[in-house]
Amino acid sequence: AYAWQNKGVDIPALPEPISVRYGVFSPIRGEYLNLIKTTELPPDTRLAFDIGTGSGVIAAILALRGIPKIIATDTNEDAILCATENFMRLGVQTAIRLEQTDLFPSQHPLADLIVCNPPWIPARPTSPIETAVYDPDNAMLEKFLSQAVQHLNPNGQVWLVMSNLAELVKLRPQDFIPQLAEKHGLRVIDRLDTRPGHAKTKNTHDPLHEARAREVTSLWKLTPSQRVAAKL
């Protein structure tokens, strides 16, 4: 953590390293960030939300892609401070507004794009930093999807970044994401996959090696279902 804050973390999708404070999740698994950088944006995207911004890396990538206004949120005060420093370092601070809040910003127009990289494992965290990885009973994921449509333009998109590790170790059913999205008025329009390249995928002594070797990280593109869009 000391090195992450002082020497920085190299992010291939960004022009220079970012600083990560102690207690803030470090995006050392960067494979999904290339999806954020290269996936086609919704047409005429003027306003985007980065929900659970952490170090601010996703919001920074969106700003560098030319989205003129981004609102990034987090409940963690250290994350807000960390993201502020990184936005200044990358020169994107004028495009991004930070708000310390639970999930969605309080007052805003409807977004054209909402990006969220929630915790991937439905289990209980044992320390504050583990809340970035563990989500008991999928509570944060369910809350996010249950509210997303209220904050999204009818033709807007939700980009949900998730690993399928929980599905591979039988903590979630295989069709969990599309079914949960449908439950909350969203439909899947695309899914873009990438394979993680972190060291644990090659560690044969890891109890989860077999699952990690098959792990896929996906960017799920969601949009309001037709019946919901008609009401918006």
Predicted segments with their positions:
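Glycine-rich S-adenosyl-L-methionine
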Residues: I129-P154
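Conserved beta-strand signature within the Rossmann-like core of class I S-adenosyl-L-methionine
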Residues: G156-M162
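SAM-dependent Rossmann-like transferase core, predominantly class I methyltransferases
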Residues: A1-L47, I51-V57, R212-R214
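Class I S-adenosyl-L-methionine
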Residues: I177-R227
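Short "lid" loop at the C-terminus of a central beta-strand within the Rossmann-like core
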Residues: W120-I121, N138, S163-L168
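Conserved class I S-adenosyl-L-methionine
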Residues: A166-I177
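Conserved SAM/SAH cofactor-binding pocket of Class I
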Residues: R29-C116, P122-T126
